[in-house]
């Protein structure tokens, strides 16, 4: 189940607000300029789908986003617990960073935790299958896929070069809960 937990950005351990209600999550995030929607990830992809199979199955969703915002490229990120690079990738994504473009993800299976540092708050968004999130360009954030990751998401880009991060050097991510 998707969830949003909001913390103060001073490392406070007590949440300011929490919900698993999709409408409440959307309202909170939209107020911060973050797009959050529940889409339908209802295609049978099998146990370990290829990126090509995922893109073919969800081309209709990609086409909607491209028509709406003019995105130029897309790919699939898929991570499983048996991936030999999981620890290195988790460490990379756990560092606070920004992008020069919106970070758009449509989760078609599994889950991951987007942590958005907006103003004086940290918004932890547990995204699961069916969730579409678009983090605005320039928003400091990090992503936790957990120690035993299992997710597949379609990534949509303005930049044909794909995922390019600008790391902030802030240790803030170390102060907040992570996925197990």
From Swiss-Prot:
Keyword Flavoprotein applies: no
InterPro entries for this protein: ARD, ARD_bac, RmlC-like_jellyroll, RmlC_Cupin_sf
Keywords from the UniProt entry: Amino-acid biosynthesis, Dioxygenase, Iron, Metal-binding, Methionine biosynthesis, Nickel, Oxidoreductase
Cofactor-binding details, from the entry: Binds 1 Fe(2+) cation per monomer. Binds 1 nickel ion per monomer.
Residues where Ni(2+) binds: 97, 99, 103, 141
Pathway recorded for this protein: Amino-acid biosynthesis; L-methionine biosynthesis via salvage pathway; L-methionine from S-methyl-5-thio-alpha-D-ribose 1-phosphate: step 5/6
Coiled coil: none
Entry-linked CDD domains: cupin_ARD (cd02232)
Reactions mediated catalytically: 1,2-dihydroxy-5-(methylsulfanyl)pent-1-en-3-one + O2 = 3-(methylsulfanyl)propanoate + CO + formate + 2 H(+); 1,2-dihydroxy-5-(methylsulfanyl)pent-1-en-3-one + O2 = 4-methylsulfanyl-2-oxobutanoate + formate + 2 H(+)
Keyword Cytoplasm: no
Molecular function terms from GO: acireductone dioxygenase (Ni2+-requiring) activity; acireductone dioxygenase [iron(II)-requiring] activity; iron ion binding; nickel cation binding
Record function comment: Catalyzes 2 different reactions between oxygen and the acireductone 1,2-dihydroxy-3-keto-5-methylthiopentene (DHK-MTPene) depending upon the metal bound in the active site. Fe-containing acireductone dioxygenase (Fe-ARD) produces formate and 2-keto-4-methylthiobutyrate (KMTB), the alpha-ketoacid precursor of methionine in the methionine recycle pathway. Ni-containing acireductone dioxygenase (Ni-ARD) produces methylthiopropionate, carbon monoxide and formate, and does not lie on the methionine recycle pathway.
Assembly and interaction partners: Monomer.
The protein's name: Acireductone dioxygenase
Organism encoding this protein: Cronobacter sakazakii
Source taxonomy: Bacteria, Pseudomonadati, Pseudomonadota, Gammaproteobacteria, Enterobacterales
Underlying gene: mtnD
């Amino acid at each position: 189940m998707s969830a949003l937990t909001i913390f103060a950005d001073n490392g406070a351990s007590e949440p300011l607000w929490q919900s698993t209600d999709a409408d409440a999550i959307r309202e909170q995030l939209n107020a911060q300029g973050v797009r959050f929607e529940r889409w339908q990830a209802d295609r049978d992809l099998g146990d370990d789908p290829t990126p090509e199979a995922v893109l073919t199955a969800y081309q209709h969703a990609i086409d909607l986003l491209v028509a709406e915002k003019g995105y130029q490229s897309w790919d699939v990120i898929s991570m499983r617990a048996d991936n030999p690079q999981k620890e290195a990738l988790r460490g990379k994504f756990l560092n606070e960073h920004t992008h020069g473009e919106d970070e758009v993800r449509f989760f078609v299976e599994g889950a991951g935790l987007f942590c958005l540092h907006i103003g004086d708050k940290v918004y932890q968004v547990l995204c699961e299958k069916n969730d579409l999130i678009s983090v605005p360009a320039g928003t400091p954030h990090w992503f936790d896929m957990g120690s035993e990751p299992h997710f597949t998401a379609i990534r949509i880009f303005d930049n044909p070069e794909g995922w390019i991060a600008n790391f902030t050097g802030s240790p803030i991510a170390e102060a907040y809960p992570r996925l197990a």
